[in-house]
């Protein structure tokens, strides 16, 4: 009887719109961990899991058609999946606040040297299960940042190519150990198009560039990683190829969006465990972004998590950016497929420590600074 009621409420009235709903579902669920919970939220549910409607008794017991219909987050065949609340608290459709639309606000300032084409990646993969080796050439803006110390040149951080002359990385990657001064530009170099740091026969054909200018945020604080962003200017113009091209900056898209619960990608050559060995090959992982308040509470004994920070990771740990991933990109695709740089790997408690997400510099909070300094 329950099954029949559910189908009469949801499935049959929606058959005429199943194509539209399925398309929206794919857009929402395109980049997910199939082995992890599919997190979701809507105006009825602050935090939920996208699951088969028959498995969500909390919503079924409400006997509210509009609530069920507007909670749809996907389909299993023709059976709807709904955003099922993690707690028993869920408001009815008559109590829910009205849906709002946001008018796109014009950006205050846009760098004149942004590329016309950006964010085009080279993989058909739409999901990552845990951390894994990235396909060769999948992330063509990924940058290895080298530092020469004591005559030895080694990868210390990651970065993201954003124009044909500029790489964005973390401020803590470019300052001295005291965090007081920027290291000279000639100790830095970058490598584009790399896959395996220690192999020359992996078909990646990387290219090295010297760095002529290093600009870090003038109000960077090493103790709290506040304003953890820097721009490297390369000595020559980068010729874009299928394996080397820039990621988009969120000037016209994502700038004012609430990114909580979204699942961006992070890439790097960092260690796969705290104090463990570095990875020779580029690795990728996909992590959910935390609600700001949850992140603030997680770190409230350590520092004040303001709006310039963004947190991502699983509450039970297990997957995270790690040592050596610093400065690397947090990347989110838009509906048209282009990837945007929304975060910079900054810091965390060890690596994937339960209860403590990784912390990232929120790029949308620094777009005016980038426009001013990326010349």
From Swiss-Prot:
Residues 90-113 are annotated as: Disordered. Coiled coil: none annotated. Glycans are attached at residues 122, 235, 304. The active site is at 172 (charge relay system), 228 (charge relay system), 326 (charge relay system). It is found in: Cytoplasmic vesicle, Secretory vesicle; Secreted. Ca(2+) binds at residues 194, 196, 199, 202. One of its GO terms (biological process) is protein processing. Transmembrane segments: none annotated. Residues 39-84 form the Clip domain. Proteolytically cleaved into its mature active form by serine protease factor B. Cleavage produces a 25 kDa light chain containing the CLIP domain and a catalytic 31 kDa heavy chain which remain covalently associated through an interchain disulfide bond. Proteolytically cleaved by clotting factor G subunit beta. InterPro entries: CLIP, CLIP_sf, Peptidase_S1_PA, Peptidase_S1_PA_chymotrypsin, Peptidase_S1A, Trypsin_dom, TRYPSIN_HIS, TRYPSIN_SER. SMART domains: CLIP, Tryp_SPc. The keyword Plastid does not apply. Residues 128-375 form the Peptidase S1 domain. Its EC number is 3.4.21.86. GO terms for cellular component: extracellular region; transport vesicle. Inhibited by intracellular coagulation inhibitor 2/LICI-2 and to a lesser extent by intracellular coagulation inhibitor 3/LICI-3. In the active form, heterodimer of a light chain and a heavy chain; disulfide-linked. Forms a covalent heterodimer with intracellular coagulation inhibitor 2/LICI-2. The clip domain consists of 35-55 residues which are 'knitted' together usually by 3 conserved disulfide bonds forming a clip-like compact structure. This enzyme is closely associated with an endotoxin-sensitive hemolymph coagulation system in limulus. Its active form catalyzes the conversion of coagulogen to insoluble coagulin gel. This is Proclotting enzyme.
């Amino acid at each position: 009887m329950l099954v029949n009621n559910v189908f009469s409420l949801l499935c049959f009235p929606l058959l005429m719109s199943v194509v539209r709903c399925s398309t929206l579902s794919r857009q929402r669920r395109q980049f997910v961990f199939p082995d992890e919970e599919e997190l979701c939220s809507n105006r009825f549910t602050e935090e939920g899991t996208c699951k088969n409607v028959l498995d969500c008794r909390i919503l079924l017991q409400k006997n509210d058609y509009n609530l069920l219909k507007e909670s749809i987050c996907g389909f299993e065949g023709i059976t709807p999946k709904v955003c099922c609340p993690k707690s028993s608290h869920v408001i009815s459709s008559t109590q829910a606040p009205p849906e709002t639309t946001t008018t796109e606000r014009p950006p205050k300032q846009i760098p004149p040297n942004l590329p016309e084409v950006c964010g085009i990646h080279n993989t058909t993969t739409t999901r990552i299960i845990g951390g894994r080796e990235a396909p060769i050439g999948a992330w063509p803006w990924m940058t290895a940042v080298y530092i020469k110390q004591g005559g030895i040149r080694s990868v210390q951080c990651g970065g993201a190519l954003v124009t044909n002359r500029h790489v964005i990385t973390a401020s803590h990657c470019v300052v001295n150990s005291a965090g007081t001064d920027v290291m000279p530009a000639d100790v830095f170099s970058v490598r584009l198009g790399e896959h395996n740091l220690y192999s020359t026969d992996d078909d990646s054909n990387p290219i090295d560039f010297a760095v002529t200018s290093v600009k870090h945020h003038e109000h960077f604080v090493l103790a709290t990683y506040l304003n953890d962003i820097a721009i490297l200017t390369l000595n020559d113009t980068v010729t874009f190829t299928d394996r080397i091209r820039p990621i988009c900056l969120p000037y016209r898209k994502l700038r004012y969006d609430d990114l909580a619960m979204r699942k961006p990608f992070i890439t790097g050559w960092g260690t796969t465990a705290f104090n463990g060995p570095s990875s020779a090959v580029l690795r990728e992982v996909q992590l959910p972004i935390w609600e700001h308040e949850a992140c603030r509470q997680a770190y409230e004994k350590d520092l004040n998590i303001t709006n310039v920070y963004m947190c991502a990771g699983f509450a039970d740990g297990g997957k995270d950016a790690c040592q050596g991933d610093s400065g690397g990109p947090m990347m989110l695709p838009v509906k048209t497929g282009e990837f945007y740089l929304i975060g910079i790997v900054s810091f965390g408690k060890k690596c994937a420590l339960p209860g403590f997400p990784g912390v990232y510099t929120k790029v949308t909070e620094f777009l005016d600074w980038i426009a001013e300094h990326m010349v």
